Amino acid sequence: MVGPESGAPYTVPWSRCDVPGLVRLDIEPHSTPSARKIARAVEVLHDGKVVAYPTDTVYALGCAIESRRGTERIYRAKRMDEHKKLALICPDLSSASMYAHFSRTAFRVARRVFPGPYTLVLPATREVPRLLIDHSHRRRQVGIRVPDHPIALALARALGRPLLTSSAIPPGEERALADPEDVELHFGRHVDLVIHGGPTPGEPSTVLEIIDDEVAILRAGLGPTEGILDT
């Protein structure tokens, strides 16, 4: 098929997959992803649906922060325990500060590691939906990510609010998926759109909990920890 004016090959920005209702969206992981294709994915998110997309660590399942239906579908897809909470993907520190309280230490660490393969567990603000708070703990906390990946950041910016996110780990397995074809195979019937943005490193983010001036490593992952505790 060719374009009517240039004669160049014409490709649609998205296509239907073998799974009924599932849309596949091919986006090259360049520094500036196609705005038209990002808008197509954001349209799905605005509808309260679930999108699988690449990050700087692994593929993830995500929905808009206010989508209770999307949140429930992510939990069902992964067969997650209700006490395991989703994190928030924010485009920058400014937006992240609306949902988490940053102490001086937390701000210094965030400036050092974001954007990058880290999750910071911080005190949650009132903007965080109750369904994201683990009430079995005394503290209201939330996981914050600002990934170093153009597609994930473009989604969060265009959406205008954070993405609820969870690594694409199939039920009964320990490792998250790093390839979009595997995401379709395991989660194609549980999501509405899969962004094919190339392979990811396949290692989880490093998780740091920061309470006041204390920094603790909850999980070692792709992000190095050398020097972080010396803030």
Tell me what each language-model feature is:
Residues 13-231:
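Active-site-adjacent structural elements in enzyme catalytic cores
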